[in-house]
Amino acid sequence: MSNGIGEKIKYFRIKHNLTQEELAKGIVSVSYLSKIERNAADPNPEAVKKLCERLGISPEKVLDKDIANDVMRWMESLLKRDLVLAHDLYQGIQTNIEKVIDADLFCLVKLHTLYYFVLTKQTDKAKQKLKLLKQDQKHFSKKETYYWLKFKAHFEYAESSYEKAFLHFQEAERLYSDVFKGDSEEYYDLIYHVAKTATVLHYSYHASVYAERALIYYRDHYRLERAAKCHILKGVNYKRIREMDEALKQFELAEALGKRLSSDTILFRVYEAIGELFHDLKMPTQAIRYYSKAYELVKHQFSVQELNAILGHVKTYIQCDKQEFSKDWLEKADTLLKTEKNMPLRYVYQVKVLRFVLYGFTTQFEKLLVKEVIPYFKSRKLYIAYATYVRLLGDYYYNNRKYKLAAEYYAEAHQAMVDIQHTDNK
């Protein structure tokens, strides 16, 4: 009798759209079926046989030595983000799910399915899978808990809940040595994503340390695309601590790898990052040159990347007081948002606020920031963006002679910066 018979019965009961009452009728009590499905009772063989007959499945293990290999290949394809292979293997695994259950791989498959849905941007399915997995988490083994933390973090990152993602990636890291022997690609994939998430949150110390650790591994193992991404992360964090020469060096190393790989994805990130560097240095001519190179790689894709390149132009033309150029590029941003309805809110808010910057501040600006923008960034602990918008609202109040309110918002912006340093130093 399969040790995972409860999981098998539950899976196929749900697949056949049967309630526990419908499946149990005339065979066992509902409470006993519930215990069988949770593997909380030693199942009666005769009862299990009848339940399986009703579901059209075998009460015995259907052993297939190939299914374990297929599952391992699928997990590896997800780790390497080979989505074409992952899709093909996923179809085969779903067709042979009974064999997966009998091989005691069902829980690992369920966990990796969450990650598969995240990578393939099947958001609704990912949310549904996350909800179901939460119900099972207290029964996870250490290995299953590791993947649960890691893949939940990926889901949270995709949902812009970066602080939650960061904490769960770190929890997974602490559990890693209890599950795996030695440092593997799995480990450095986790380390890379800690660095990436820390960079979004402006945790410069964590981002730099983790990016360097990941870079050494990917460079030594000739994983050039990941190595390039690590150089970009290091460059971004050097820029934030005003080490501009070192930042540019990292970006140039990434650019060389991007050209070697003929990777527009890498080159876009490099050109965008160099554009930001020159923008920060108040060198608008150079900034526009790189933002334009970035834009040429992604125009007409209606993507976050295209919007970022557009916003780089808007902000840089504002910086050098070329308002008409800024307005032209802002119209491109508006057109993109009308076409692509699912753009993350952090970018939508940038466009809305820049419109006020270019066309004048009104009471609608105050309402937008107080009711929507500031709460959004505060709730996600995106403190740099939060501080920027809080300070902008402070300027609005100051210019309208509401000095007490302005002082309160300036103080809040300062506290947000302190909070970043405090969290990064933990």
Briefly describe each language-model feature range.
Residues 73, 113, 152, 194, ...:
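Structural register within alpha-helical repeat arrays
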Residues 101-107, 140-147, 181-189, 222-229, ...:
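Alpha-solenoid helical repeat architecture
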Residues 91-98, 130-138, 170-181, 212-223, ...:
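Amphipathic alpha-helical segments of tetratricopeptide repeats
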